[in-house]
Amino acid sequence: MRRVVTLVSKEQAEVGHRFRVVEVPDECRTCRLYPVCMGRLTPGRAYKIVEVRPYMGQRCKITDGEMVPVVVEEAPMIGLVPLNKALEGVVVTFEGECAGCEGCPQQVQVGEKIKIVRVLGRAKCRGGDFAIVEFYALGPPSPSKSGGATASRDPSRAPPSRPLSK
C-alpha cells in the first residue's frame, strides 16, 4: 500500500524481508539520517522491502554498520472491527469499538482511517460480534469534529461582556 524510501542495515537489505518497528531509540532522533531512516517509519507497524537501492556510504550512528536505501511497503495488519464495517475495500474510521482482547488493533489510534483489505473470519470481544480483518492504516486521526470544543479559548478574543441590568 503506502511505499516509502528508508534505510536498513546491509544484512536486512533483501527484497521480501519483513520487519516491525517496535520503537525508535532516542539515539536515532539526534542522528542526521533520522529524517530518511527511522523518521519515515511508524512504531508498531510492519514493513516489507520491495526494492533495494545502491549503497551510498551511510553508516548507522548506533551500530556503525552500513545502511542501505530501500523502498518498503507497509504490511497489512490484522485486527477486529464491528461486523457492519467489515466490507472488503471499504475505508472506515477506527472508533475503538474493540478494546482489551487479543485481536484488538493495538497499532491504530481512535479516529484513524483504515482500509479493509480482506475479511478473514469472526470473533467475539466483550460479548460483541466482530470480524477479523486484514487492513491498512491510512493516516493519523482526523482533527476533532466537535467544532473546537476541546480547544482552549483565548480570553482576549471573547466578546465584550455587558453588565447585568437591574
Curated annotation (Swiss-Prot):
**Which residues are the signal sequence here?**
none
Which InterPro entries does this entry report, sorted A to Z? UPF0179
One family name in Pfam for this protein:
UPF0179
Where does this protein have compositionally biased stretches of type Pro residues? 157-166
- Domain of life assignment: Archaea
Provide the residue span(s) of the region labelled Disordered: 140-166
Q: Which HAMAP family match?
A: UPF0179
Q: Which family does it belong to?
A: Belongs to the UPF0179 family.
Q: What is this protein called?
A: UPF0179 protein Tneu_1978
Q: Which organism is it from?
A: Pyrobaculum neutrophilum (strain DSM 2338 / JCM 9278 / NBRC 100436 / V24Sta)
